[in-house]
Swiss-Prot record:
Protein name, as recorded: tRNA uridine(34) hydroxylase
Active-site residues, record numbering mapped to chain: 183 (cysteine persulfide intermediate)
Keyword Thylakoid: no
Job description of the protein: Catalyzes oxygen-dependent 5-hydroxyuridine (ho5U) modification at position 34 in tRNAs.
Pfam family, one: Rhodanese_C
Disulphide linkage map: none
Enzymatic class: oxidoreductase
GO molecular function per UniProt: oxidoreductase activity, acting on paired donors, with incorporation or reduction of molecular oxygen
Organism: Aster yellows witches'-broom phytoplasma (strain AYWB)
Length: 308
């Protein structure tokens, strides 16, 4: 995290599924504007909309929000805002991609039509306590490992694009169930819940505003969430449950409670693993013997060691 003398910083997360006819031109103009405000972060622009997370001084973030909302396409965009004491991104990246989130479907789903009904945080809390409801985590395996809703189903996928195949292989688990999906901020569930409806599942819902909104809502305060929430910035993990903290993460090597993520020191692997500091040193920051012996091992380079 880039430290500064000013602690008045914000990080925002937002998305909007809305047609953007010329994503590249939009991207170029947007980059110049964000750069002029001194904002850092990552934004994806596609013909289907925008998905972004940015950090910067409070005044500049609010200028950005106000400016974006002046565009009729984004006048109803919901911004999830958190206070931070520094920039949480190293740089500004705005890319044009085919999809805001990659579900890799052969046929695109129409997000303007049938998608999972929204459950407000209070309604989601009620669903968490109902017996016949299937709570389905729509995030990646390393996100689930750090924290998740109690009794949520883990598809154990490495990438979001793996979810459709998981659904087809596990139809027996989902059939005739009330399915409630959740993700970090909601952008993945918009598309995933629409896919579920298209596949013939009728009783489909999604957590409105994602885990972030659930954790901050005064009536829910993140209850029945265990662990921490993985975020895609330099914080890596943030608190959701304001009532109690239950550690669910386990060290990759010894299985002890752990909430510290590292990337495998082999740059060609880069796998994220939960790992205590002493095990990082013991295993040279690598996830396997093969990776620890890699000639480009970053841990060894950092500590001026040589492979044996």
């Amino acid at each position: 995290m880039t430290k500064t003398s000013n602690s008045s910083y914000l990080v925002i997360l937002y998305y909007q599924y809305v047609p953007i006819k010329d994503p590249q031109t939009f991207r170029n103009q947007h980059f110049k504007y964000c750069e002029s405000l001194g904002l850092l972060g990552r934004i994806i622009v596609a013909q289907e909309g925008i998905n972004g997370t940015l950090s910067g001084p409070k005044e500049q973030i609010h200028k950005y929000i106000d400016q974006l909302k002046q565009d009729v396409r984004f006048c109803n965009t919901v911004f999830k805002i958190e206070n931070v004491d520094a920039q949480v991104f190293p740089r500004l990246s705005i890319k044009v991609k085919p999809e805001l989130v990659n579900l890799s479907l052969e046929e695109k789903v129409d997000l303007t039509k049938d998608k999972g009904a929204y459950l407000a945080p209070q309604e989601f809390l009620q669903a968490l306590q109902e017996k016949d409801v299937l709570i389905l985590d729509a995030r990646n395996d390393y996100e689930y490992d750090l924290g998740h809703f109690r009794n949520a189903v883990n598809p154990n996928i490495r990438h979001f694009r793996d979810l459709p195949n998981w659904v087809k292989q596990n139809t027996h688990l989902l059939k005739n169930k009330k399915i409630v999906t959740y993700c970090t901020g909601g952008v993945r569930c918009e598309k995933f819940s629409t896919f579920l409806k298209k596949e013939g599942f009728v009783d489909v819902y999604q957590l409105e505003g994602g885990i972030i909104s659930y954790g901050k809502h005064p009536e829910t305060q993140g209850v029945l969430w265990d662990g921490q929430m993985y975020v895609f910035d330099q914080r890596i993990a943030v608190t959701v449950n304001q009532k109690e903290h239950v550690i669910v993460g386990k060290d990759y090597f010894d299985g002890t409670p752990c909430e510290r993520y590292i990337n495998c020191s082999n740059p060609q692997c880069n796998k994220q693993i939960l790992c205590h500091e002493h095990n990082e040193h013991k295993y040279l920051g690598a996830c396997s013997d093969k990776c620890s012996a890699h000639p480009q091992n970053r841990y060894l380079k950092k500590h001026n060691n040589k492979t044996s």
